[in-house]
A protein has these predicted regions:
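Solvent-exposed, polar/charged alpha-helical surfaces in well-ordered, non-transmembrane soluble domains
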Residues: 16, 41, 45, 59, ...
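Proline/Glycine/Serine-rich low-complexity intrinsically disordered segments
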Residues: 88-93, 117, 125, 137, ...
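Secondary-structure end/capping motifs
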Residues: 190-272
C-alpha cells in the first residue's frame, strides 16, 4: 500500500515509525513527494492509496469528485504555518506593494487571505509571487520576495536567519489541520494495512514522548533541521493520539466535520471552491474507534 506525503514535520511520525523498524514485514511503502500538489495529483489518478493532506486540500479533491475519506488527524497547526517577512517590513500593513511568495495551493491561498484580511489588505494590494515550497529558502536568501507564506521546515530555517513572524496559524486556531486520507478503494481492500500504518504512527508518537532526544535525532536529517529545530517546529502543532482522534472523528457531526463545514464556507466565499462539496463521506471513523480502544 502506497502512502504519500510532502516534507512536513507533522507527517514525520510516519517516517519515524519506519526508521524504528515498525514497518518491517508490513506491506507499506512511504512515498516522499516535493509538495502536496503532487500528492493531490497522485490521488486524482489513483497512483497513491493514502496521502497526507491539509483539510482544505481534502475539500478541494472532494469537490472534484475524487473518492477519498479522512481516516486520521495527523496534526493541528498552532503556529507552524506562518507569514514571514524580511527585517525591513515592520508589520502586516506594511506589506502593501510588497512581493509575497506563496505556494499555489488551497492552503497557501487560505493563509494569505487570512493574513491580508487581518491587515485590512486585499490581494490586489500586494504582488503575489507563485513559489513552490522547495524554492522558499532560496527565494528568501536572494531577496526575490519580501515575505513568504510558508511552513516548517522552511519556516524554522528562515526564523534562524532573522525572518520575522507577521501572522501564523495561532491566529486562526483549529483551521489548519493535516489529515490522512484514503481512497475508498483502499478502504475496501486494505483496511488492515491502514490500521497497521496508524498503529505504527501512534507507536512512533509514544517513542517521541518517551525518548524525545532519540526521536529528534532520528527525525532531524530528513527535515534538514537540527534536533532543536525539530523540537521548535513540533511546538507549533498538536499531534492527536488515538483518544483525541476518536473525539475529533467519531459520532454524528464530530468536531472535524464541523471544522470542515466552516472551512468549506470560508473557501467558497473566497472563491477557492466553485461550489460546496457533499461532506457525507468526508470521514471514515473506524480506525479512530479501534485506536481509542487500544489507547492506554
Amino acid at each position: 500500500m502506497s502512502i504519500g506525503t510532502n516534507t512536513w514535520v507533522g507527517y514525520e511520525p510516519l517516517y519515524l515509525a519506519r526508521d524504528l523498524g515498525l514497518h518491517e514485514g508490513l506491506a507499506l511503502r512511504l512515498v516522499e513527494l516535493g509538495s502536496t500538489t503532487q500528492a493531490m495529483d497522485a490521488l486524482r489518478v489513483g497512483s497513491l492509496d493514502v496521502a497526507g493532506l491539509t483539510l482544505d486540500e481534502t475539500l478541494t479533491l472532494l469537490h472534484e469528485g475524487v473518492p477519498i475519506s479522512v481516516v486520521w488527524v495527523m496534526n493541528i497547526s498552532a503556529g507552524a504555518d506562518a507569514v514571514l517577512a524580511q527585517a525591513d517590513v515592520p508589520d502586516l500593513a506594511s506589506l502593501r506593494g510588497r512581493r509575497i511568495g506563496v505556494e499555489q495551493t488551497a492552503l497557501g491561498a487560505y493563509m494569505l487571505d487570512a493574513a491580508l484580511r487581518h491587515a485590512g489588505l486585499k490581494a490586489e494590494d500586494v504582488t503575489i509571487v507563485p513559489l513552490p515550497v522547495d524554492e522558499h529558502v532560496s527565494a528568501w536568501s536572494t531577496g526575490a520576495v519580501d515575505a513568504l507564506v510558508t511552513f516548517d521546515p522552511p519556516r524554522q530555517m528562515l526564523l534562524d536567519t532573522g525572518a520575522r513572524t507577521m501572522f501564523d496559524s495561532r491566529q486562526i486556531p483549529g483551521q489548519i489541520v493535516d489529515v490522512l486520507v484514503a481512497r475508498r478503494a483502499a478502504l475496501q481492500c486494505c483496511a488492515a494495512r491502514i490500521a497497521q500504518l496508524i498503529a505504527s504512527q501512534q507507536q512512533a508518537l509514544a517513542h517521541l514522548q518517551a525518548q524525545p532526544q532519540d526521536a529528534l535525532q532520528r527525525m532531524a536529517p530528513r527535515l534538514g533541521l537540527s534536533p532543536e529545530g525539530v523540537a521548535a517546529a513540533l511546538a507549533g502543532m498538536e499531534l492527536p493520539d488515538g483518544a483525541a482522534n476518536q473525539r475529533l472523528l467519531a459520532g454524528a457531526n464530530p468536531p472535524l466535520a464541523q471544522t470542515a463545514g466552516q472551512l468549506m464556507q470560508a473557501m467558497w466565499q473566497q472563491g477557492l471552491l466553485p461550489r460546496q462539496p457533499d461532506l457525507g463521506q468526508l470521514i471514515d471513523d473506524r480506525f479512530a474507534h479501534t485506536s481509542a480502544e487500544q489507547t492506554p
